[in-house]
Amino acid sequence: MVKRAVVLISGGLDSTTCLAMAKAKGFEPVCLAVAYGQRHAVELEQARKVAAAMGVTDFRVVSIDLRQVGGSALTADIEVPKDRPSDEMSHGIPVTYVPARNALFLSLALGLAEVVGSTDIYIGVNAVDYSGYPDCRPEFIRSFESMANLATKAGVEGAHFTVHAPLSGLTKADIIREGVKLGVDYGLTHSCYDPDAQGRACGRCDSCVLRKKGFEEAGVPDPTRYTESA
């Protein structure tokens, strides 16, 4: 019997690799993307392309307007930091943190999992290269999993939900190497927080810098379309 898993997908490098890993484990993925008012909405179109390229037949988008909440450079009129040194990137919580984003995303995935009869949820959080986001930490994932089994009908009736975060202990280079082994086309992915009108990556935000560094350290050509000034 085919086992289904809900996979949170953003169209980025990490979530795309996570999807490939879920498929490699034999799961039939139900992909869930979230339109939350993010300034880099181009990632949603890339998520569709990634899912189609991987043969996903169940792709869903849930809309939740976090611009009404604000508090982040991704959802409000706050400038996205550029050209930050690595030591600055590794300390503190950056303004690109979206308040409670992964808690919200996982809650949506949990509800969908219960509806489609799945007990497995995949999320591509990674805390090795970038430890600034509190909702990317393994302890958060474990805590959410515990909550999931207390807060759902399926959970209290004996089903056990598992939140898989297979990238949590990997560097960006490790993630890329794993994805290459699994046949991921990274040319379809988008990571930039502040792309131009053509969807090209700025090459200077934290996400772009980490992506560039990952490809360089992995020894894999970077297929990203950057702006001419990047």
UniProtKB/Swiss-Prot annotation:
Signal peptide: none annotated. Catalyzes the ATP-dependent conversion of 7-carboxy-7-deazaguanine (CDG) to 7-cyano-7-deazaguanine (preQ(0)). ATP binds at residues 9-19. Pathway: Purine metabolism; 7-cyano-7-deazaguanine biosynthesis. It catalyses: 7-carboxy-7-deazaguanine + NH4(+) + ATP = 7-cyano-7-deazaguanine + ADP + phosphate + H2O + H(+). Disulfide bonds: none annotated. The keyword Acyltransferase does not apply. Belongs to the QueC family. This is 7-cyano-7-deazaguanine synthase. Keywords: ATP-binding, Ligase, Metal-binding, Nucleotide-binding, Queuosine biosynthesis, Zinc. The keyword Disulfide bond does not apply. It is an enzyme of class 6 (ligase). Zn(2+) binds at residues 192, 202, 205, 208. Binds 1 zinc ion per subunit.
